[in-house]
Protein backbone atom coordinates (compact mmCIF):
# COMPACT_ATOMS: atom_id res chain seq x y z
CA UNK A 1 0.00 0.00 0.00
CA UNK A 2 2.74 2.46 0.95
CA UNK A 3 4.64 1.81 -2.26
CA UNK A 4 1.50 2.34 -4.31
CA UNK A 5 0.81 5.65 -2.55
CA UNK A 6 4.38 6.74 -3.26
CA UNK A 7 4.14 5.72 -6.92
CA UNK A 8 0.86 7.60 -7.33
CA UNK A 9 2.34 10.77 -5.80
CA UNK A 10 6.00 10.45 -6.76
CA UNK A 11 6.38 14.17 -7.47
CA UNK A 12 5.82 14.90 -3.75
CA UNK A 13 8.56 12.54 -2.58
CA UNK A 14 12.35 12.69 -2.55
CA UNK A 15 12.41 10.08 -5.32
CA UNK A 16 12.81 10.60 -9.02
CA UNK A 17 11.34 8.51 -11.79
CA UNK A 18 13.13 5.15 -12.21
CA UNK A 19 14.07 4.85 -8.54
CA UNK A 20 15.21 1.42 -7.39
CA UNK A 21 13.82 -0.57 -4.47
CA UNK A 22 16.37 -2.32 -2.25
CA UNK A 23 15.71 -5.64 -0.58
CA UNK A 24 17.55 -6.50 2.65
CA UNK A 25 20.61 -7.93 0.90
CA UNK A 26 20.85 -5.02 -1.56
CA UNK A 27 20.60 -2.58 1.33
CA UNK A 28 23.42 -4.23 3.23
CA UNK A 29 25.56 -4.61 0.10
CA UNK A 30 25.13 -0.91 -0.73
CA UNK A 31 26.48 -0.01 2.71
CA UNK A 32 29.28 -2.59 2.41
CA UNK A 33 30.36 -1.13 -0.97
CA UNK A 34 30.41 2.36 0.56
CA UNK A 35 31.80 1.50 3.99
CA UNK A 36 34.62 4.02 3.48
CA UNK A 37 32.03 6.83 3.77
CA UNK A 38 31.19 5.67 7.28
CA UNK A 39 34.75 5.06 8.49
CA UNK A 40 35.41 8.83 8.46
CA UNK A 41 32.64 9.55 10.98
CA UNK A 42 34.18 10.65 14.25
CA UNK A 43 33.50 8.19 17.08
CA UNK A 44 32.11 5.46 14.83
CA UNK A 45 34.38 2.84 16.38
CA UNK A 46 32.45 3.27 19.65
CA UNK A 47 29.08 2.29 18.16
CA UNK A 48 30.09 -0.42 15.68
CA UNK A 49 30.49 -4.11 16.48
CA UNK A 50 33.84 -5.87 16.32
CA UNK A 51 34.43 -7.50 12.98
CA UNK A 52 34.82 -6.61 9.36
CA UNK A 53 33.00 -4.38 6.93
CA UNK A 54 30.08 -6.80 6.49
CA UNK A 55 29.32 -6.70 10.24
CA UNK A 56 29.48 -2.92 10.13
CA UNK A 57 27.14 -2.85 7.14
CA UNK A 58 24.68 -5.06 9.01
CA UNK A 59 24.79 -2.79 12.08
CA UNK A 60 24.37 0.36 9.97
CA UNK A 61 21.30 -1.12 8.28
CA UNK A 62 19.85 -2.10 11.66
CA UNK A 63 20.41 1.42 13.03
CA UNK A 64 18.73 2.96 10.00
CA UNK A 65 15.81 0.53 9.88
CA UNK A 66 15.07 0.76 13.60
CA UNK A 67 15.21 4.55 13.77
CA UNK A 68 13.25 4.93 10.54
CA UNK A 69 10.49 2.56 11.63
CA UNK A 70 10.16 4.34 14.97
CA UNK A 71 10.00 7.75 13.21
CA UNK A 72 12.89 9.05 15.31
CA UNK A 73 13.97 12.64 14.65
CA UNK A 74 17.53 12.23 13.36
CA UNK A 75 18.17 15.99 13.53
CA UNK A 76 17.40 15.95 17.25
CA UNK A 77 19.79 13.02 17.67
CA UNK A 78 22.54 14.93 15.84
CA UNK A 79 22.51 17.64 18.49
CA UNK A 80 22.33 15.22 21.42
CA UNK A 81 25.24 15.71 23.85
CA UNK A 82 25.71 11.93 24.13
CA UNK A 83 28.46 11.11 21.64
CA UNK A 84 27.10 7.64 20.85
CA UNK A 85 23.64 8.99 20.03
CA UNK A 86 24.97 11.77 17.80
CA UNK A 87 27.37 9.32 16.10
CA UNK A 88 24.53 6.92 15.29
CA UNK A 89 22.60 9.88 13.86
CA UNK A 90 25.58 10.75 11.64
CA UNK A 91 25.72 7.13 10.47
CA UNK A 92 22.01 7.13 9.59
CA UNK A 93 22.32 10.54 7.90
CA UNK A 94 25.19 9.24 5.77
CA UNK A 95 23.13 6.21 4.76
CA UNK A 96 20.08 8.32 3.92
CA UNK A 97 22.24 10.65 1.83
CA UNK A 98 23.46 7.63 -0.14
CA UNK A 99 19.86 6.61 -0.80
CA UNK A 100 19.01 10.11 -2.00
CA UNK A 101 22.09 10.42 -4.22
CA UNK A 102 21.49 7.06 -5.90
CA UNK A 103 17.67 7.40 -6.11
CA UNK A 104 17.10 4.33 -3.95
CA UNK A 105 14.53 3.35 -1.37
CA UNK A 106 14.59 0.48 1.11
CA UNK A 107 11.70 -1.24 2.90
CA UNK A 108 11.82 0.99 5.98
CA UNK A 109 12.15 4.13 3.88
CA UNK A 110 9.01 3.17 1.92
CA UNK A 111 7.01 3.45 5.12
CA UNK A 112 8.72 6.66 6.22
CA UNK A 113 8.28 8.30 2.82
CA UNK A 114 4.59 7.35 2.80
CA UNK A 115 4.11 8.65 6.36
CA UNK A 116 5.86 11.92 5.48
CA UNK A 117 3.76 12.27 2.33
CA UNK A 118 0.51 11.76 4.27
CA UNK A 119 1.43 14.13 7.11
CA UNK A 120 2.86 16.91 4.92
CA UNK A 121 0.26 16.85 2.13
CA UNK A 122 -3.16 16.95 3.76
CA UNK A 123 -4.92 17.12 0.38
CA UNK A 124 -3.44 13.75 -0.62
CA UNK A 125 -4.39 12.29 2.76
CA UNK A 126 -7.96 13.56 2.41
CA UNK A 127 -8.27 12.14 -1.12
CA UNK A 128 -7.08 8.76 0.11
CA UNK A 129 -9.38 8.85 3.13
CA UNK A 130 -12.33 9.61 0.87
CA UNK A 131 -11.51 6.61 -1.31
CA UNK A 132 -11.19 4.18 1.62
CA UNK A 133 -14.34 3.05 3.41
CA UNK A 134 -12.84 0.34 5.60
CA UNK A 135 -9.39 -0.83 6.59
CA UNK A 136 -8.83 -4.47 7.51
CA UNK A 137 -5.43 -5.56 8.79
CA UNK A 138 -4.55 -9.22 9.30
CA UNK A 139 -1.60 -10.30 11.48
CA UNK A 140 -1.80 -7.00 13.36
CA UNK A 141 0.59 -8.33 15.99
CA UNK A 142 3.29 -8.03 13.32
CA UNK A 143 2.85 -4.30 12.72
CA UNK A 144 5.43 -1.78 13.84
CA UNK A 145 4.99 1.79 15.06
CA UNK A 146 5.09 3.52 11.69
CA UNK A 147 2.72 1.00 10.09
CA UNK A 148 0.22 1.60 12.87
CA UNK A 149 0.53 5.37 12.42
CA UNK A 150 -0.13 5.04 8.67
CA UNK A 151 -3.18 2.86 9.34
CA UNK A 152 -4.57 5.44 11.78
CA UNK A 153 -3.85 8.31 9.38
CA UNK A 154 -5.61 6.61 6.48
CA UNK A 155 -8.51 5.35 8.56
CA UNK A 156 -8.85 8.55 10.55
CA UNK A 157 -9.37 6.27 13.59
CA UNK A 158 -12.64 5.02 12.05
CA UNK A 159 -13.73 1.78 10.38
CA UNK A 160 -10.49 -0.03 11.16
CA UNK A 161 -10.67 -3.75 11.85
CA UNK A 162 -7.58 -5.63 12.96
CA UNK A 163 -7.03 -9.35 13.44
CA UNK A 164 -4.08 -10.96 15.14
CA UNK A 165 -2.75 -13.22 17.84
CA UNK A 166 -0.45 -11.78 20.48
CA UNK A 167 1.13 -15.24 20.90
CA UNK A 168 2.38 -15.19 17.30
CA UNK A 169 4.47 -12.02 17.05
CA UNK A 170 7.02 -12.96 14.38
CA UNK A 171 8.47 -9.69 13.14
CA UNK A 172 10.00 -8.18 16.26
CA UNK A 173 13.28 -7.96 14.32
CA UNK A 174 11.51 -5.43 12.03
CA UNK A 175 10.22 -3.37 14.93
CA UNK A 176 6.87 -5.15 15.25
CA UNK A 177 5.34 -5.08 18.69
CA UNK A 178 2.43 -7.03 20.13
CA UNK A 179 1.66 -3.88 22.11
CA UNK A 180 -0.10 -2.58 18.98
CA UNK A 181 -2.72 -5.33 19.11
CA UNK A 182 -2.99 -5.39 22.90
CA UNK A 183 -3.60 -1.63 23.10
CA UNK A 184 -5.66 -1.31 19.90
CA UNK A 185 -9.08 -1.13 21.62
CA UNK A 186 -8.00 1.95 23.60
CA UNK A 187 -6.70 3.77 20.53
PLM feature segments, named:
Residues 1-113, 122, 130, 158, ...:
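A basic/glycine-biased coupling hinge at the interface between accessory DNA-binding modules
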Residues 131, 139, 165:
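Walker B catalytic acidic pair
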Residues 118-134, 155:
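Short basic/glycine-enriched coil/helix segment immediately N-terminal to the Walker B
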Residues 115-119, 145:
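Short gly/ser/thr-rich secondary-structure transition/capping motifs
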Residues 2, 124, 135, 140-151, ...:
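Catalytic P-loop NTPase motifs of RecA-like helicase/translocase cores
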Residues 145-187:
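Conserved RecA-like helicase ATPase core segment
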Amino acid sequence: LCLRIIKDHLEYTRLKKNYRLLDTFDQQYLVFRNIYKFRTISGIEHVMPKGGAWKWAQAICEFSNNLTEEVVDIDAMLSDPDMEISTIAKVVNTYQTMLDEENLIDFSAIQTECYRLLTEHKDILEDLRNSIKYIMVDEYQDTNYIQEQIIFLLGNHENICVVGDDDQGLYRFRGATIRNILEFPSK
